[in-house]
Design a protein with these regions (language model features):
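Short charge-dense sequence patches
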Residues: 24, 75-79, 107, 136-149
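Short, ordered beta-strand-loop transition motifs
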Residues: 31-38, 52-55, 136-140
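Conserved binding-pocket/active-site segment within a compact domain
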Residues: 119-168
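Proline-rich intrinsically disordered, low-complexity coils
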Residues: 65, 84, 101, 136-138, ...
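Short Lys/Arg-enriched alpha/beta "domain-start" segment
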Residues: 1-38, 69, 78-133
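Intrinsically disordered, low-complexity regulatory segments enriched in Ser/Thr/Pro
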Residues: 47-72, 159-168
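N-terminal accessory interaction module
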Residues: 37-48
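Short, charged/polar micro-motifs that form catalytic or ligand-binding hotspots
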Residues: 63, 112-115, 142, 146
Length: 168
């Protein structure tokens, strides 16, 4: 008997179907994507991913990427403004329009995890940022701008723990 799909698999399947309903030619223009008859190609953290035009499946050198990667791509296609343009300014997560409901989860999952993993390990964090194609920033003990997509960067500003403060 075939096992039921996980909630994650169901969410990906729903979004895959949404992708198939999107105007792919409009996505190519909007995000300046490479494309051919079979696929669209998008660069995500310096890796070129393939999105099959017929079935909407996303692959990274033939392997399906994880849930977060797939959802970031589908959500970017679906929710981006009609004419997305970077402001050129780096802003705190809480200052991004319409993210307030997600800030607690962001702190709990992303921020606390970064603090836990990289506290006392600045060299490792710098290496990870460089592997992701990051460019150094002068702020923090480790500061980098990371290219999520060619049209969207994020900044990681990390201060290591010391005798007065926890890592942040």
């Amino acid at each position: 008997m075939k096992a039921d799909r996980s909630n994650y698999e169901q969410v990906i399947e729903n979004w895959r179907q949404k992708f198939l309903d999107m105007d792919q030619d409009a996505l190519i223009r909007k995000f300046n994507l490479e494309a051919d008859e079979e696929a669209l190609y998008i660069t995500y953290f310096s890796r070129k991913l393939r999105i099959d035009r017929r079935d909407g499946r996303i692959t990274d050198q033939g392997v399906r990427p994880g849930f977060d990667t797939v959802m970031n791509i589908y959500n970017t296609f679906y929710y981006a403004a009609e004419h997305p343009a970077a402001s050129g300014n780096l802003v705190a997560f809480r200052q991004v329009k319409r993210v307030y409901p997600f800030e607690a989860a962001y702190r709990r999952t992303i921020i606390s995890r970064l603090q836990e993993i990289f506290s006392g390990k600045i060299a490792e964090l710098k290496k990870a940022c460089e592997i992701l194609g990051g460019t150094p920033l002068p702020q923090g003990d480790a500061g980098y701008v990371l290219p999520v997509f060619p049209f969207l960067n994020i900044a990681v500003l990390f201060w290591d723990k010391d005798e007065e403060f926890d890592a942040q």
